[in-house]
């Protein structure tokens, strides 16, 4: 945390939040790192949970301190996940090119990140192809700030919204003079552009997404 503070990164609970711009297109980038499994005497590497937005793609990555043997036919790892006191669930996460972890990318990452927004802890078990297990339980204190930063940079909302919800938001934007076209419940480029214009008008970050702060400003509960 001392190094993160010196580097000017935000700190929220167990998370450090680094902001930058992509070299290829100047799009906003966020790397949020959960340090709750940090061990000062581990010189081989650290176990960490990383939520990030890089060049418009969201990822959630479980980083391990060992080199791992994945399922080469599926290029993935068997995972056991448990959020707070909920029943555990089985999943498969993609292997990393570094061979030191596994992750979810794109819409899969967005969906899972939404599911831990209000959680206090996350247990992960990664199983190598040889059966060796790697367990970690992360304290998620401060995760809402980290998740909102990642979602804002990649232009998605941390809320689980239905088609009817999106249609209602589009109707509100049209009524306020921010044209989305015919409200259809699909959050496409026209809706994103209209939302950005509204966000600028009320002094909010231009995410283009119906995020929590924007919906509160719109009067949507």
Pin down the residues of each PLM region:
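Short acidic, glycine/serine/threonine-rich helix-capping segments at coil-helix boundaries
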Residues: 161-164, 174-221
């Amino acid at each position: 945390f001392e190094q993160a503070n010196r580097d000017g990164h935000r700190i929220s609970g167990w998370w450090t939040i680094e902001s930058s711009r992509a070299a290829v297109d100047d799009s906003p980038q966020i790397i949020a790192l959960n340090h709750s499994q940090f061990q000062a005497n581990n010189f081989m590497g650290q176990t960490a949970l990383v939520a990030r937005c890089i060049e418009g793609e969201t990822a959630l990555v479980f980083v391990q301190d060992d080199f791992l043997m994945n399922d080469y036919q599926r290029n993935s790892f068997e995972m056991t996940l448990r959020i707070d006191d909920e029943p555990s669930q089985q999943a498969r996460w993609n292997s990393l090119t570094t061979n030191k972890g596994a992750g979810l990318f794109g819409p899969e990452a967005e969906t899972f990140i939404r599911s831990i927004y209000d959680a206090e802890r996350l247990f992960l078990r990664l199983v190598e192809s040889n059966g060796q297990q790697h367990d970690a339980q992360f304290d998620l204190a401060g995760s809402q700030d980290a998740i909102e930063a990642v979602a804002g940079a990649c232009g998605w909302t941390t809320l689980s919204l239905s088609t009817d919800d999106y249609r209602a938001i589009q109707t509100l934007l049209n009524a306020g003079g921010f044209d989305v076209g015919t409200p259809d419940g699909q959050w496409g480029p026209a809706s994103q552009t209209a939302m950005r214009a509204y966000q600028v008008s009320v002094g909010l970050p231009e995410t283009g997404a119906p995020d929590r702060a924007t919906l509160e400003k719109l009067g949507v509960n």
